[in-house]
């Protein structure tokens, strides 16, 4: 039988009457060190047999390990006898190390559900889950990683829950959010904390060493006052960069609000399919430079047919002026584009565009940092997409510790693979 269990050899193998095979193995060497004093002994006190779990091998396999119980060679040692332990079968192990490696590879590397992996390997769910949980200890300490750029973003942990107060009888809505902290240079998730307020992020940052915090130079966030407060309070040397995606999203929301308001003012109802502005509402949100000549002609037709006040076109122009700011390559270009943006806002003269312009002005220092450094939350958003895939694979999680373990291990594996395939580049997490 070719069993290939490292440091072990097969001494017997029989086919079982009901199918499968029983394989009896023994270690290549008898000698082992005492777990208390470390003195190596080869004197056998007795032999014992232990049934252990191993990876499937040409069908169902029942593995029996013949272990020697050794006598400690040190007379002053308090332990008289001990059982042999190896790298594949540590002390009190009931599964081989290669089985645990196989479980971890299937769950983390290939993203399979723990329940499905446990069933395919013939072990209990808790055995597979404990293997995943124990792998967290093998991850490098965050304080030991050389991190200079961070990305912070939130994601919803699970569906909205309603809880009833036993004293008042009132119901309260709870949205379970988690905040993801990512190394934006390589996309590795460094931490996942409960909540999306400043206290959650501050708690994680203050747990890092002062030297680690002093090395961080740029932090990319969405336009969140809570994240901004946490970063400015805990990272004194870091500049804040606001993510361009979220700024464009705010611009699109501004256009949508103007369109909805005009629909009520002009038609005294919500938009319908017969209204060109509603029928082509997604066209209004597209970047003008991404449109084909046919799309640009259709956009002009929509604004000419369903924008009697000109406010919708003005709001669209403000949104496009913002995109020109974000497309700038230098601070001088950005400031010149900001001047044109302000002119568009004055010409639009609507409440929606004024509020939008106030937001851009408030976050202008962070916008300049984004343009100067090029740091965005793109890899943070990519990490959140991978996190959502993990959540869907597990059909949701009731235990947040298990959820965070899957996220950190999966992200560390992807970052390690990225380093192996990107040698010589700047994509390095260490």
PLM region spans:
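Acidic/histidine-rich catalytic cores and adjacent linkers
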Residues: 36, 42, 171-175, 183-188, ...
